[in-house]
From Swiss-Prot:
Belongs to the UPF0102 family. PANTHER family: UPF0102 PROTEIN YRAN. InterPro entries: Restrct_endonuc-II-like (IPR011335), tRNA_endonuc-like_dom_sf (IPR011856), UPF0102_YraN-like (IPR003509). HAMAP family: UPF0102. This is UPF0102 protein DVU_0833.
């Protein structure tokens, strides 16, 4: 049996994937896992690979979806993206990290798509550090 929190998260990811497709993104993978790492949605738009984190919250929740994208979570997303790029041999592709915030209000939800959700130099602690090893 699926617990309520998992069902809420899955519904949010379904809504986010539909939004991305409506806005011209091509879904490559969903819930991609490598070891203990996971990427919610991997898609592409134009020549850019987009790693999308989906955060779903109830409207009455204590934290906003954007607050859930902590420094530690950003590091895990970068590690997961590196693993996917290695597995797909896609190191030469431009990449970015997006966030889709899903706020549920009863049977309806609102979605906010934030492109380039975080600055990689801030996350990696240096102005010249590239997260992709080339």
């Amino acid at each position: 049996m699926v617990d309520a929190r998992h069902a809420t998260g899955q519904h949010g990811e379904d809504e986010a994937a539909a939004l991305l497709q409506r806005t011209g993104h091509r879904i490559i993978a969903r819930n991609w896992r490598h070891g203990g790492l996971e990427l919610d949605i991997i898609c592409e738009t134009g020549d850019t690979i987009v790693f999308v984190e989906v955060k779903t919250r109830a409207a009455h929740g204590l934290t906003s979806p954007t607050d859930a994208l902590t420094h530690q979570k950003r590091h895990r997303l970068i590690r997961a993206a590196r693993a996917w790029l290695a597995a797909a041999d896609a190191w030469d592709r431009a990449c970015r990290f997006d966030l889709v915030c899903v706020t549920q209000r009863g049977a309806t939800c609102t979605l906010e798509h934030i492109t380039d959700a975080f600055d990689l130099t801030e996350t990696l602690g240096g102005g010249d550090t590239s997260w992709q090893p080339w």
